[in-house]
UniProtKB/Swiss-Prot annotation:
Record-linked NCBIfam families: PRK01470.1, tatAE
Protein name (record): Sec-independent protein translocase protein TatA
Natural source organism: Rickettsia typhi (strain ATCC VR-144 / Wilmington)
Protein's UniProt keywords contain Transit peptide: no
Classification of source organism: Bacteria, Pseudomonadati, Pseudomonadota, Alphaproteobacteria, Rickettsiales
GO function terms (MF aspect): protein transmembrane transporter activity
Keywords: Cell inner membrane, Cell membrane, Membrane, Protein transport, Translocation, Transmembrane, Transmembrane helix, Transport
Compartments (UniProt record): Cell inner membrane
Protein purpose: Part of the twin-arginine translocation (Tat) system that transports large folded proteins containing a characteristic twin-arginine motif in their signal peptide across membranes. TatA could form the protein-conducting channel of the Tat system.
Length: 53
């Protein structure tokens, strides 16, 4: 049971209503930075395990 297009549209509409048009670009920017930092952290974590073994 995946998300259909209508479900995705409803979720995006709710996010738009909660954050408003002015705040939405800042929220998306912060989310992207957080995801990038998480990916870099996971990449660094994998390298540390190889060095310790």
């Amino acid at each position: 049971m995946g998300m259909s297009f209508s479900h995705l549209l409803i979720v995006l509409l709710i996010i738009f209503v909660l954050f408003g048009a002015g705040k939405l670009p800042q929220v998306m920017s912060d989310l992207a930075k957080g995801l990038k930092a998480f990916k870099e952290g996971m990449k660094d974590d994998g390298n540390d395990n190889d060095k310790n073994e």
